[in-house]
Each structure stands twice: as C-alpha cells, then as structure tokens.
Amino acid sequence: MAREQDYYTLMSGMQQLDLQGKAVPSDLVLIGEHAFPLAMNPRGQVLMAASHYGRGRIVVLGHEEYLTRFPGLIENAIMWLMPCTGDAGVVGIQKSLRTVAENLNYSPFKTELGDFQDRFAIYITDAYSVESSAKDLIAFLKAGGGLIIAGQAWSWSYEHPQENTIRNFPGNKVCSVAGIYFSELEGEVGTFPVPRNIPSSWLAVAIGKDFKEDLEFLLEGVSEFDTQGGAIASEVMVHGPLAFPIAVTPNGKTFIAGAYYGQGRVIVVSHEGYMGRDSLSSFMINAIKWLDEGRKGVVGIVPNLTAAHTVLSKSGLDCQLTGFREDLSVYVCTSYSDAQCAEIQEFVAEGGGLLIGGHAWYWAQTHCGSNVMTEYPGNHILNKMGLCLLGNTLGGGLYKAPEIEHSCKHGYHFRSMLQRFAQHVSQGQELTDREQGCLKQLGTDCASYLQMRCHDSAAYTSVVALLSDIVKEVGVPQVCSNCPVESPKDHLMLHIGTEVYKVTPDPDALLPYIIKDRPNLPTLSNARVRITANTGGCEEWISTGLYLSPGMKTYIAVPPEIVGKNWQVQLGCQTDNIGGSNTLKRAPVVHARFPLDSEMVQVWNLWGGLIYLIAPSQTKVDGVEIVVQNAVQAPYFKSGETSVADWVSHIRQAPAPWAELEFENLIMTFDSAFIRNLDRPDEVAKLWDTIMRTITDLAARPPKLPRKERFVADVQISYGFMHAGYPIMMHSGSAPGLVNVEEAYKCGLWGAIHELGHNQQRGVWEFPPHTTECTCNLWSLYVHEQVFGIKSANAHPAITPADRQARTKMYFDGGKDLNSWCMWMALETYMQLQEKFGWDAFKKVFSLYHDMTGVPNDNAGKMNLYAQTFSKVVNLNLSPFFKAWGWPIQPNTEQNLSHLPAWSDHPVSQYA
C-alpha cells in the first residue's frame, strides 16, 4: 500500500512523540482517499497528517511548535516531499519560522527564509499567514511542490465565533484541497508511541463538523420534500466525515445529502428529476445558494436539465445551460457520466460548488455482477467526497423536512453509528433503543462501504481494521437451522463478518471467528472436468461434482477457448438472498462468482460450496477441460455417465455436504444426507425424465429442454414454500420427496411441478396478477394425470368437486368481480376448458403463441387475443363462455368469432 510506505518514510527512526507541554494542537479532520494520519492520540484525535494533491505532497502539523520540537520529523518530511521536484531544490521557510531554518543548518537541505516563491521545491509555513497566497500555494502543490503547514484553529475559532472554521480558517484555505482540515477542537496531548503502521482507532471514526448551520440555511422555508410521482430514486450513502444527510425517508434512507470537499461543497440528489420540480424549488434555490457561497457567480447547468434550469433561475443567480467550465461558481449535472471526473473533483476541491442528480438502481439492474460503489459513473465523482449512490430503489412520498436539532444530535450517520457500535463492543456501553433500531442500516452501510475496496485509502483501511477487530472481539453468530439469527446485533455481526472477510488483507486470520466448526474433509488434487455447453438466450450452470470447504482456496486452470469470454466460476448453489428476513438460518448471501479472465484463476468463498462453471448465453464449447488444483469430491450422479454400481459402492459416500443428481432435463441439489442411502438413482432419473418430457409435451416444446431445470433445497429461501426461477428453490424438508419414487406415484408432487409450471409461463398468454398462481397449475394437473394417474379431483385438496362448486358459486354470487378471479378461481376457468376440449387444445394454443407477434401489452387486449386463439383452435365461439366469467370481451372479438358456432351450453351458462 502506497500510503503505508509514505508513513514509514515520514516516521522513520521515531519511537515516540512527546507532545506534552503548553502547546495545545488542533484535532485534524481527514477526508478523501489520499490523507492519512501521522500522529493520533488515545482519543482518536489526529494531531499530524499528510496527503497528496495533484503531483505534490503536504504535511500538516496540529501546532506550529511541532516544527521545532520534532526536527527529525521535519527532516523526514522534507525528504518525503523532495522527490516530487528533485533533491536539489530549495526549501523555502516563512520569515517568522527562523528557528526551523536554524535547525536545518546542519542538514543537507538548502534553505531560504522569506515569502513564498514558486521556484521553491518545498515551502514551510504556519497556518495563519497563508490566506493571501492560498491560490499560489495550491497551484504550487498541484504542480508537484511540497508543503509543510503547522498551526491550530481552536483559538482562531474562539476569536471568530460566527465563522465556519472548516471553511474560513486561513490554513484550511490551502490544506483542505488535500483533504486535511484544522478543526476548532482542541487535541489532547501526552507522550504517544509511534506505531509501525498508520495509526487508526475506532474513536477516529467520527463526524468532523456540526452541520447545524448548514441545515438551517438549506432548510430555510422548507417544511417538506414532495417526491411523489413516478420518479424512482436511489438511496444515498453518507460516509465521509464532512458529509451529512439532508432529506431522509421515515425509515432512515437518505435521498438528498451534502458534503464539504476541499474548499468547495457538493449536494447529491438521488434523482435528476427532483432538481426541476416546482414542489422542491424552495430547497433547490437554497441548495444552489449554499453551493455558490455568496460569490454570485455563474451556475452552469448541463443542457439536458432544462427543467432544473427553470427552477434554479428563480434563485436570481446567473444560470446558464452549458457544459463544464472552470470559470463556473456552481456546476449542475447528472450522475450518469464521469467524462470529466478529475476536472470536476478539482473544481470542487478548489472552491467550486457541485449539484449532481441521478439514481444508480437502473445501472445496477443492467450491470448485474458489477460493483455499484466502484463502477457506477457518478460514484467515481462522489466517493472521494464522502457520498455515494446505492443500487437500491426508493419510492416517492411526501416527507417532512428534518427537525434540525434532532437531526444533528440523533440523526443516523454511518460514521457516528459505527463509532457507537465500536464503543458498545469495546467498552460495553449500552445502545439506546434508537441505536438498536439503526443496526440493520449500519450493517447494510458497512457492506456498501467495504465494497469500495479502496485499499490505498487510510480512511478505508482503518474501517476495515476496525471491523476486523470487532469481529475478533464479538465473534460471528454460528447461524444454522438450530441456531437462527434473530437479534439486530447478531444480524449486524453476521453481515459484517461476511463482508469484511472479502476485503481484509488476512482473511485466514478472521475465518476462525466467523466459522468455528470447519470439518477437515479429504481433498482431490488436480481434478479434471470436461465442459460441454450449447447455451441459448440464458446463462447456464455446469456442474463439476466438486466442492470447496468454507474459506478453502484453490486454483483453476482454464482452457484458452473460454478465457475472457464471459465465463465465470460460481461457488455455492444457494443463490437466494435472504437478507430481508427477520430470522436467518444461514447467512443472507452464501455464493460467490469469479470471472474466468486468465488461464489460472484463484477462487474461494467464505461459506464454501459446490463448484460450477457459468456458461454465458449464446455459447458453444465441446469437451474443453478445466483442472481444479484442490477440491472435495461431492456425491454426483449423472444419467448416462454414472453407473448405479459405482454410485452405491462409493460415489454416494463422497465427503462433500452437498450432492447433485443430474438427469436428462433436470438437476437436483440438496444436502448429501438425503441421498446417502439412495440405492436406485436410476429409478429417480426415470421418474423425472418422464415428468419433464410430460411438461415439455404440454408446452408444445421439444422433449429436450435447451437448458436443464434446477432444484436446490436449502435450509431457508427468500420467499414462499418454494419459488420458481433458475434454480427453483425449495426448503430442505421437501428434498426427500423428490427422490421417493413410490411416494410420488401414490401422492403426487404438486408443489415441485407447480414451480416447473411457473417456469413454463409466458407473458403473451399470462394476465398478471390474476393468472400468476393459476396457469402454472395446468402442468401440475397434466403431470398428475398423465404420469401418476391421479385425476384432478384427487390431485390437490383445493380442487375437489365440492370445493370447485362452492368457489364458483361464491364468485358469481359476488358479481363475478375480475379482481377476485385469481389462483384457484382462475384455474376453474381453465379446468372447464380442459374438461370440454382436452389437453390437445392447450398444446395447440401454446404452439400458436410460440411465434406470435403483435401481442398486446395490456391484460384486456391479451385476454381478447386468448379468447380468439382458443376459439379458433376448437372451432367454437368461446366469447359467451369468457364473458360469463367476467372477461372484458370486446365487440370486435365477438364480431371476429361470429362465424363460428357459439359454445352456449358451457358450465357457467346459468350465470351468463
């Protein structure tokens, strides 16, 4: 890490810092990616710091006396600063600092007392007399010069009680561009050892300013934030010491926030449409004035934000539709481009204002697998400023403006809440009920923050170190079905443990605190797996029959045919995110993916898991081979390749805790315990091959699916008893029934086939929400009848003749309200069609839809099309039947079908 090397150079040869005496330093506030502490007291206050800006470097000391008290540090600092300009440069020293020059008389450095000149290589000055030359010093620093600035701001703040110290203290006019600020807080002194690494402390994770005055200005005349309507915003995460929330939903989600950055300011609005809303104009006008800081300069607004231009022009400022220019006072843009990222950051750091609007949720949805924190364009601009846009969504609403006193003292802020939790862990201080209620948000924010993966930032690495220490101090709950996680604190620790493991420099040291019981399973070396794939429009999981234990690392040798072609490795079959559940029986996310972007890839997963190759869509390979360096053998039966004898003799006893059965059209994955005593996997294969061919038969599809369906049985799933998708997820308790052939023929498998039916549903003949839980049951009915010989009356308790009759009567007695036509009630309509016309009619209807174009998007249009399609298949006018059921059959549909004989004696004719 570059910052660590900088620290070693600056503190070389120093064992301790004796700061005792009358000199009371300022506590320094650090922001951004480049600033790092050199000296920190036990209260977490930073008393010395260093940073980079442009091509130059800067060292900041919290009191001017330190310039003479620590000559060794000053010499180290000069050595560190000098490489930017060449070691033959002159060290300029402010006239009042003659003693500093005298201390350097015996050093190899050439010094010169006097005012700043840009010919100097380095300039040493106090923090009180730089205001007049601030612009020159910043330009000098940016061009590669070195600065040492020393002083304290607490006495200045006493003399200027109405002034904003962060903004107006003279020293901050210079060093703030590098992310270092003198604060009005007095630093506690003493004798402190110099740590080997950059100092950090949970106490240092604090907010650097009271934002009361800022909020008073921004919220003047603002009583509410009206974000009602169709605009869907993102959440803003506020993570910097000088960043603060402005507008927050009742459940604590920020959608407008501000920050100080360098000498400038920024406000982020999590939907660009908000900037042009009349209902938010009072706030927006305040915001643009806060950003302008009284300069009355030009406000540049990107040309596509015409509505924002209309609103902001009411401020009385000179608002112009223009691209970015350095001569602007405030720049207004969206977060969807980072084309001028560095220029915008520099513009703000050197005093400009930035109003940026946009959401990240659509980008996140269209860039699956990408990291919103590091890859979303707007976050390239915002992260350094202590703000970022998250990938989740926030609906609109009418939200009260925050009560300022309460917001400043009790409002949620990531840094202050993290500090409070660290205090709770290290000192046993009880959390208030309000703070307990914030733990879930803290866990989410910790995960988001860690995803920045900014390992060259001292601020980031200090949070990683803090969270690692918390994990070691508290431990992570050993979540399982017998030990579920329920309390907010346990939720938080599970979340933190999972996420910090991914980014800590030493994950192996954390592993025993996260997973305490890790069985030592026997492994295979250099396992070879042949890969064949011919994918259609979707990606496909390819099983390997191999498993990695929790935390186990391995290398995979990848054939050049698939390197860099969007192939991935996935570890773990449980892809459901159960983070929304109040009770957890496993961690929320337990799988991991790695791109195959080189011929040798290292993979691992905290929670372990089966190893899969993920073939991208529209890909064809035949027999390429991967080699897995070390892995655990899993029980894996594949029809046509695995013999029953081999299965019984040894494969089913393979040590991995997850097993797979792969058949012609279906792959099942579940706990190995469910198949240890399975003697006839071939009989299970025969059953499911028959079921799956029957499913494709009703769907009027070829008997071999383009992609095999998957079942995964897990201890907990994201919703429902089972749910459709790829894979279809179900609870572990359902797994034994999938392989019990005798029981299946006796009682059927309604639930599993219901989910397979969901995967056959097509939007062109679906009428959501009415038929969402209805038409999938056609496959359950068909399979039970054709495969199990179970008639509909016995296939499910909800469709006995008595239940059907009673439900139908209730529907029609209630006025055949289509809002009540759903699930079992809707299924009755389709069952009546099937009982009259048979299954072949459905097959023909589905077949016609395969290549149909011009299908309406609305339910009414689709229902009329369905009525016409079914009528033409059976050569009867079904309009009377569908009208009787309350379908919105249109006159032109009746006209189009009028040449066909009407089905007048249909089962609900008495209700027509």
Swiss-Prot record:
The gene is tcaf. It comes from the Eukaryota. Belongs to the TCAF family. Residues 539-838 form the Peptidase M60 domain. It comes from Danio rerio (Zebrafish). GO terms for cellular component: plasma membrane. Coiled coil: none annotated. This is TRPM8 channel-associated factor homolog. May play a role in the regulation of the cation channel TRPM8 activity. GO terms for molecular function: transmembrane transporter binding. Gene3D superfamilies: Peptidase M60, enhancin-like domain 2 (3.40.390.80), Peptidase M60, enhancin-like domain 3 (1.10.390.30).
